[in-house]
């Protein structure tokens, strides 16, 4: 699995992951503010939304 591992889409850093999912974490009430991207699917947090997906580079 190949996932993006950066906070903004301008820096197209990718990593190869053993996990079969990628994630994108962002602030729930502030559209467009991405906190993190990476491998796996972390647990939900208060005031954070996490989008998990199952294909290469799906967390853009």
Swiss-Prot record:
Tissue: Expressed by the venom gland.
InterPro entries named among the record's database cross-references: Snake_3FTx, Snake_toxin-like_sf, Snake_toxin_con_site, Toxin_cobra-type
Subcellular location, principal: secreted
UniProt GO cellular component terms: extracellular region
CDD domains xrefs: TFP_snake_toxin
Molecular function terms from GO: toxin activity
The keyword Secreted is assigned to this record: yes
Disulfide bonds: 3-22, 17-39, 41-52, 53-58
Keywords: Disulfide bond, Secreted, Toxin
Location of the protein in the cell: Secreted
The organism's place on the tree of life at top rank: Eukaryota
Keyword Disulfide bond part of the UniProt annotation: yes
UniProt cross-references to PROSITE patterns, sorted A to Z: SNAKE_TOXIN (PS00272)
Family: Belongs to the three-finger toxin family. Short-chain subfamily. Orphan group XI sub-subfamily.
Official protein name in the record: Toxin S5C4
Organism for this UniProt entry: Dendroaspis jamesoni kaimosae
């Amino acid at each position: 699995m190949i996932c993006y591992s950066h906070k903004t889409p301008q820096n197209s850093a990718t990593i190869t992951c053993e996990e079969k999912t990628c994630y994108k974490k962002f602030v729930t009430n502030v559209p467009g503010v991405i906190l993190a991207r990476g491998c796996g699917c972390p647990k939900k947090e208060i005031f954070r939304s996490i989008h998990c997906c199952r294909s290469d580079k799906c967390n853009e």
